[in-house]
Curated annotation (Swiss-Prot):
UniProt cross-references to CDD domains, sorted A to Z: B3_DNA (cd10017)
Protein name: Putative B3 domain-containing protein Os06g0632500
Record keyword Repeat present: yes
PANTHER family registered for this protein in UniProt: B3 DOMAIN-CONTAINING PROTEIN REM-LIKE 3-RELATED (PTHR31674), B3 DOMAIN-CONTAINING PROTEIN REM14-RELATED (PTHR31674:SF62)
Cellular compartments per GO CC: nucleus
Keyword terms of this UniProt record: DNA-binding, Nucleus, Repeat, Transcription, Transcription regulation
PROSITE patterns per record: B3 (PS50863)
Organism: Oryza sativa subsp. japonica (Rice)
Annotated region of DNA binding: 27-123, 141-238, 316-393
GO molecular function: DNA binding
Subcellular localization(s) per the UniProt record: Nucleus
Length: 393
């Protein structure tokens, strides 16, 4: 199911999945990340100290997992070799959060001179420094970080602690599928396999790595959305977030990767009158969303000529009979379908009639307890301009 997406603007990030003892006192960061983090207007250390050390230093602010702001020195080598590191103040921050050898950190640039910090424990899971009260929703969804090793290229073990905390109730079969949504814009179905006591990403995993040019040394950051849906961020071997400027999104039904056959790969919503004098097929339903606060992905739609169709409808599709309420108020979408394609929270969605045409309609997608729905002026405009009528399917 092709998904149309524009530029993916993500905040720069740096990942260090396995800290050494030296990293607890001085954390090396890539020069490109340091260049974006460095605030030229921020107050640095004294000029005399700079001259004595032979290195330029700037003060940056690091927001810890509990919200406390730490002042840390960012030092860069004057030799222009790209060497940079977090120095003064970093060791105090690390000690305050109990960081040790084998822990991991991810820094995200919030703006010039300011970065936020996430910490991962030796079990590779997002560290929780406080337990939310019962009934309270935490901002951070469960995450785990993975530095790819040679043995992970054919099958990858999900951290045991993560399985125990988040997957035990959901993962009930020895063979069950997970959906991985990656920054490249593809939805991949990968088989989960139980090999006591481990849970492995197996069938479909190697094609996923190959399609995204991932190998030993790459870093993956998984975020669990629920219902066996994971989003993943990809980092280069130097720890910098891999940036994708364009995306063509697909929903794969097997381990062979995206299918080239539109009849099998595209989700279809049939729209036709009761007497079936005319049929319109809306294909390629896909999801595009903004960055963090509404992390979703675009819905692209393709209308085929008015002729009879004999095709295989993908599992990830649905058919709706249009009513006056669905046209003028809202169109409901099954909760299982939303979960299946990664629509998990309110976002803006782009509807397209054809991937080859420029026309598109921006509509609002929202969630209720057991279903999702599309509504608002954008949806009504889409119905009007595409002549959707009552009792069409």
């Amino acid at each position: 199911m092709p998904l149309s997406a524009g530029s993916l603007r993500r905040r720069p990030k740096f990942a260090a999945p396995l800290l050494s003892p030296a990293c607890l006192h001085r954390l090396s960061v890539p020069g490109e990340f340091a260049a974006r983090l460095d605030d030229d207007d921020a107050a640095g250390v004294g000029e005399e100290e700079e001259e004595e050390s032979g290195r330029r230093a700037a003060a940056v602010l690091v927001v810890g997992p509990l919200g406390k702001v730490w002042r840390v020195e960012l030092r860069r080598s004057p030799a222009g070799d790209g060497e940079a590191w977090l120095g003064g103040g970093w060791s105090e921050l690390a000690a305050a959060h109990g960081l040790g050898e084998g822990w991991g950190v991810v820094l995200r640039l919030e703006r010039r001179g300011v970065a936020s910090l996430r910490v991962f424990d030796p079990g590779f899971c997002l560290a929780r420094f406080c337990t939310p009260h019962a009934g309270m929703r935490t901002k951070d969804r469960p995450r785990f970080i993975k530095l790819l090793q040679q043995e992970d290229l054919e099958k990858m073990k999900i951290p045991e602690k993560f399985v125990q905390q988040h997957l035990t109730e959901t993962y009930t079969n020895n063979h069950q599928n997970a959906i991985i949504v990656c920054p490249l814009g593809k939805f991949w179905r990968v088989e989960l396999q139980r090999e006591q006591p481990d849970v492995l990403l197996r069938d479909g995993w190697a094609p996923f790595l190959a399609a995204h040019d991932l190998s030993e040394g790459n870093i993956l950051l998984f975020r669990y959305e629920g219902n066996m849906v994971f989003t993943v961020e990809v980092f280069l071997q130097n720890g910098c977030l891999k940036e994708y400027k364009t995306a063509a999104l697909y929903l794969t039904d097997g381990t062979e990767g995206p299918s080239n056959a539109p009849q099998q790969s595209a989700a279809k919503v049939g729209v036709s009158p009761v007497k079936r004098k005319r049929t319109r097929r809306i294909e390629g339903t896909c999801l595009e969303g903004p960055n963090r606060k509404s992390r979703a992905s675009p819905i692209s739609v393709k209308v085929e000529p008015h002729k009879k169709h004999v095709s295989i409808v993908s599992q990830n599709s649905f058919t709706k009979e249009m009513t006056a309420y669905s046209i003028h108020s809202l169109l409901s979408v099954r909760g299982t379908f939303c979960s299946q394609i990664g629509l998990l929270e309110a976002c803006a969605i782009t509807l397209k009639i054809s991937m080859k045409k420029k026309g598109s309609w921006r509509v609002a997608f929202k969630t209720a307890n057991t279903y999702g729905y599309i509504n608002g002026p954008g949806w009504r405009k889409f119905c009007l301009e595409n002549e959707l009528e009552v009792q069409r399917r």
